[in-house]
Amino acid sequence: MKILDVGCGANKYEGAIGLDNNPRTAADVIHDLGSVPYPFADNEFDLIVSRHVVEHVPDVMAFVTELYRITRHGGIIKLVTPHYTNPDWATDPTHRNHFNSYSFNTFMADRQVFDFYTEVKLKPVKNYVSLANLWRAVGFEFIVNLDQKSPKFRFTRKFWEFYLSYIFRAKELSFEFEVIKEDSKNGETKLLA
């Protein structure tokens, strides 16, 4: 399995090739993460991990599109980022982007709206919200993430996100997406990217 850790910093994912723009990190490849394309071939990786990076990039659309390009069909992209209600978000002057549970819906293969923005097609595997320690301890994090157990509980996430997230604050979001590069039309399968 070929793994890429994008924005690896000093704690590179075990067994991964590290990509970072800072030469003082554990990176194997130094490259400006805001400058695409990255120095990798199409469909090169089985797994891409990027922890606390997407909030720093200048163009989220270009970033996700580039991760999609270099991940093979059926590969996995894992992103971890602060939730927009995390009070620590504002303590880092290099943070540029805010995210919630629905921020990556534009990239989903089954998207209903905004399908003209991108050719990227991802399938959600995981979308987990980590709440502040107090709310985790009293079980509220479990309730917010019930939609991960069954789609019939989607309302719990949506209700929290839209009405309660500034009271029951989150720390971070963990996303996992499967890359979809094949499209079945008229019984034929063609590679999308």
List the model feature ranges, each with a label:
Residues 61-62, 66-68, 76-193:
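S-adenosyl-L-methionine-dependent methyltransferase catalytic module, highlighting the catalytic core
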Residues 1-86:
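Conserved SAM-binding loop
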